[in-house]
């Protein structure tokens, strides 16, 4: 496939505001791709070179990209920086530079063989793998060569890709729907395979080659999509929902981790499927000593503890582990305990279809507890009063509450069902729980906030439609430093119109690709004609909103947009409020 054909499709996707049109455009593109290149097409659309757990990054910043452009076009770096500053889009700066270049050495587009998708992808792989002495010069040489062969429009998307600002916001579920349409496979079969092996490039190659998806198996070293929980606010409701009995375990305030043990060693993956092994060398060592299985996939929570008292510390303290040069110091200041709560696979046996009570037995058989690795504290209950006693015990030792689970439940990869239910402590006069919402738009600040965004339009996610529905406009709770940080992280995601996966009645001053997730609290969930979340579910023409929303200060960098609070959860929160709200 010619790269220009991919670029033409990307431009069409970028210009649409309808998700259904986006799916059709992608399906049409996939039909034209050869089986041996479909994976590369998909990786480029998603803005990645490989799946997230491989951690392959280009290592190209904006300045290096502009240096490569300067070399390819003969345009000065100062002029390119000026173009970039004026447009706010490095892709547009690249397009203009390539369109206006009169450098004799620049190969005229059209007088040569057009770029192929595979050529572009392979060149970018070489850029990513250039390391060591002279790596920067090698990256510049490879990129400038690529720009020199690009049309202005092709260069626009190459520049955006290499600095991680593609701005398409195409989600994995959108790709799955388009693949199902293009190759005539059942969307449900693709989803199941994706939950087990969440590498869309790999899966696309399988379906394009006519290979059966049922051959996709749970594999140590490849993270599965984690099972997720719903939420309720009373023990009696929880037990009723779970059939009268529940395994209740402490809900630790840490980083959820998927631990993979194989012949190649121990690897740790985040809930976003990223390899975070480098941040937890102490956990790797502790797992090697505590787990007797040759191969296993375990689920747990990594919790920071006070080195002097052993008390559990808030999740935020683990952020010190994210800076590679600070890991050694962070291990001393913020040691961790791994609390294991599930097992997905052990020594050739896929346990995802086994009941939880059986998985618990398997977990206890292979884990030899220590001060660094423990099995999450749990008990079986069938009485709400005893659940509440256990709940208060959990809160008193520093946890967030309980996770209550059906003893007979299978491990439902990627699902947020009613077999796992969060039971968290009440926030007194505020909402029952915080919500994690996606930033989809912003409003310009005034006065002290001039030059920044003063408020943000937030949305909940609907997995069934793969859409984001607005819930509130929030401007409270942000410090001056927060507002500056929000502006910086959102600028690369700025787009000229509402994203096709966003449903909104409100007109924001600025729209973004749905990507950034933040935690919000409020007075209550109320009915509102201004927002689209659960529109018509309670009353015709009226949606749900967070009343008096406030940013808690917590950036949910551990969550992707599709892991945010769902519209179904918002409806459940509304229904369980003691007082039914009236329309605003």
UniProtKB/Swiss-Prot annotation:
Catalytic activity, as annotated: ATP + (deoxyribonucleotide)n-3'-hydroxyl + 5'-phospho-(deoxyribonucleotide)m = (deoxyribonucleotide)n+m + AMP + diphosphate
Superkingdom, taxonomy of origin: Archaea
Keyword Secreted set for record: no
HAMAP family in the record: DNA_ligase (MF_00407)
NCBIfam families associated with the record: dnl1 (TIGR00574)
Role according to the record: DNA ligase that seals nicks in double-stranded DNA during DNA replication, DNA recombination and DNA repair.
Family: Belongs to the ATP-dependent DNA ligase family.
Protein name: DNA ligase
Species for this entry: Pyrobaculum arsenaticum (strain DSM 13514 / JCM 11321 / PZ6)
